[in-house]
Regions:
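N-terminal intrinsically disordered, acidic low-complexity segments at the extreme N-terminus
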Residues: 1-3
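Exported/periplasmic ABC-transporter solute-binding proteins
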Residues: 5-77, 82-92, 99-111, 118-123, ...
Length: 274
């Protein structure tokens, strides 16, 4: 006797079919959310670059250029070169390190924090004063003979502070300059801002910062002509994205990419490496 199937809903297979379609669609939707729109690639966390404060302008431009060209996000952490190095050593977090002077990369390499470095540019110490140099400061000896006030980047946290102290200790002017220093700041940009606000008469800064501070006048002094810093970028051993970190480092060091930005912002490029 034939079985009567009249009591089994004919819509059940159809409902099961549509349920399967919905499940598949939701699965692919979740996968799509984990991918970068339009690229089919999984999103990666942004690269973290520890950058000396004096390099803020070119590096912000370079990070924006890189995002536009590759879609890779770059986060920039600014501070004094020594402060950044200490932070890297403690946290072991980040992808690239870009201090104001490559002597800090040498220290980082000695601490086994650096995998590879790429030379970029050079900068020279100058004296920042108010536009027009109203106090008529012409030499560092003026600080010994007149009650001018200084704001300095801390020699223990910032590259320019360390290099200026070493140079002026050698020529016997450090004590006079230290006595005229109202405050030591964590980074060179903090010292420049003190001059901009009229809190002090002068500050030691890098010549490359002129475009950041159009309201200030930068004076080249013979006592500072040899206070120069070589700028380079290092790939950190602690990076969890070595390939991406190397790619961005090469972008920064490329003549038509990052180096072009450095040159536009007043840096002198280092000679091409063989």
């Amino acid at each position: 006797m034939p079985v009567n199937n009249s009591n089994v809903p004919r819509s059940q297979p159809v409902l099961l079919f549509f349920a399967a379609i919905v499940a598949i669609t939701m699965t692919f939707g979740v996968v799509a959310l984990l991918r970068t729109p339009g690229t089919g690639k999984r999103k990666s966390p942004p690269l973290l670059v520890h950058v000396a404060a004096s390099l803020k302008t070119p590096m912000e431009q370079i990070a924006a250029d890189y995002l536009g060209e590759t879609g890779t996000r770059v986060e920039l952490s600014f501070g004094g070169s020594q402060t950044l190095l200490a932070n890297i050593q403690i946290t072991h977090h980040g992808d690239l390190y870009l201090p104001a002077d490559d002597s800090y990369l040498t220290l980082a390499r000695e601490k086994k924090l650096i995998k590879e470095t790429f030379p970029l540019a050079e900068q020279t110490a100058v004296l920042a004063v108010a536009k027009g140099n109203p106090k008529h400061i012409r030499a560092l000896a003026d600080f010994r003979d007149s009650p001018f006030t200084l704001s300095q980047a801390n020699p223990d946290t910032a590259a320019i502070g360390k290099l200026v102290r070493a140079a002026t200790e050698a020529n016997g002017l450090w004590t006079a300059l230290s006595n005229r220093t109202v405050v030591f700041k964590p980074a060179v940009t903090d010292a420049a801002n003190d001059v901009k606000l009229g809190a002090v008469d002068a500050a030691f800064v890098w010549d490359s910062m002129a475009r950041q501070y159009p309201d200030l006048e930068f004076i080249r002094l013979s006592e500072l002509e040899n206070v120069r810093a070589k700028v380079a970028v290092g790939v950190l051993n602690c990076s969890k994205q070595h390939d991406a970190a190397f790619a961005f480092a090469r972008f920064i060091a490329a003549p038509e990419k990052g180096l072009k930005r450095f040159q536009q912002d007043g840096f002198v490029l280092q000679p091409a490496q063989p």
